[in-house]
Amino acid sequence: MGEVILRDTVVYCAAEQYGLEDLKRLALRKQGLQIGIPADVILRSARFAYDNTPDSDSRLRAHYLALIIRSRKTFKRSGTMQMEMELGSKLYFDLFVAMCNHMDDLTEIR
């Protein structure tokens, strides 16, 4: 396969599998320090996170939703998002809900 996935996401998911809460926190903190991540890597890593964490573990998932929303200009220019959305997964419904909430928050500020 050889596709790039963010290392801290893999570490977080392994820590989830083995119940290592401190390692999960560290991996999530380190993940938040990264910048300039290509859109395709973000989406692949988000898909990996969704495939390897339970629905009840929202920390890593929320991180990816926020990252996609913050990077929305990049995703608008990228054909990667359209292709991924056509494949469909729970990630995209969660993203829709998160973006609606984000828009509601912006509306309330005005």
Q: Where on the chain are the PLM-derived regions?
A:
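BTB/POZ-protein C-terminal extensions
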Residues: 1-17, 21-110
